[in-house]
Swiss-Prot record:
Single Gene Ontology MF annotation: small GTPase binding
UniProt topology in membrane: Lipid-anchor
Pfam families: PBD (PF00786)
Gene of this entry: cdc42se2
Family label: Belongs to the CDC42SE/SPEC family.
Keyword Lipid biosynthesis: no
Localization per record: Cytoplasm, Cytoskeleton; Cell membrane
Superkingdom field: Eukaryota
Naturally occurring in which organism (per UniProt): Danio rerio (Zebrafish)
Highest classification ranks of the organism: Eukaryota, Metazoa, Chordata, Craniata, Vertebrata
The protein's name in its UniProt record: CDC42 small effector protein 2
Gene Ontology biological process terms in this record: regulation of cell shape; regulation of Rho protein signal transduction; regulation of signal transduction
Annotated function: Probably involved in the organization of the actin cytoskeleton by acting downstream of CDC42, inducing actin filament assembly.
Gene3D superfamilies assigned to the protein according to its UniProt record, in alphabetical order: CRIB domain (3.90.810.10)
InterPro entries noted in UniProt: CRIB_dom, CRIB_dom_sf, SPEC
Coiled coil: none
């Protein structure tokens, strides 16, 4: 018994090439609009405990522009010491 292969080109669609993301350079980025600086928050500020997180949230809400309703968020953090001792 012999094999017979028949190819139907009409049924096979060419796969579209994935679009490459356009590279952004500094000239494409404009100045911020309606920017209001309210606080400095560093990575170490969040690891000092929940009192610090609440303090930051209260400070930012007191500056305005964060909506009328306060948003309640549960924050769980795990601190992992990566220093070789």
């Amino acid at each position: 018994m012999s094999e017979f292969w028949l190819c139907f080109n009409c049924c096979i669609a060419e796969q579209p090439q994935p679009k490459r993301r356009r590279r952004i350079d500094r000239s494409m980025i404009g100045e911020p609009t309606n920017f209001v600086h309210t606080a400095h928050v560093g990575s170490g500020d969040l690891f000092t405990g929940m009192n610090s997180v609440n303090s930051i949230q209260n400070q930012m809400q007191s500056k305005g522009g964060y909506g009328g309703e306060a948003m309640s968020v549960n924050v769980q953090m795990q601190l992992v010491d990566t220093k070789a001792g």
